[in-house]
Amino acid sequence: RATAGAAAVAVRGPGLLVTLADPEPAADDDPVGGGGDVDPRGLVSDSDLQRVVNALWASGAEAVSINGHRLGPTTAIRTAGEAVLVEFRPVTNPYEIRAIGDAGAMSEAFLANPDVRALGTISRTYGLRFDYSRQEDLELPAAPLAELRLARSVADAEGDAAGASRAPASPADRDEPGAAP
């Protein structure tokens, strides 16, 4: 369970599928330009995704992904310019958030969450598309492993330091003026 929560392994099981999407543009009469305006308050933002993800974790999710990108304990969801990023990878509309866990219990707690109810209001008022469903079988990938550039294992560091001078263990081990030889 710890490796699943840390996103270190792929997981499979029942859960919830939540979809957030920008509103459909209003129809207009312009045959050349096509499409109408969309109220920007209905566009999916990084904070909307954060709210859904946090509500899923609070509802008992054991593993979560956004558009196939697995979320771990330190995953950042943020905006850079017009793009929504999960870690440093852009994700695009529509946003599929998958959460593995007890679908029945999660569904009830998820819908009772105040942030989820607020998204329902935004959906009705500004057209943000918001849908969720219980799923019998979801599969989430493992998160990519972090690349260590400078860190080494303790065993490697000790092997490299054999024969090299060690740091003094106590002030008495230091060569300081007035210290006993």
Q: Which residues make up each language-model segment?
A:
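Core subunits and conserved enzymes of cellular information-processing
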Residues: R1-P181
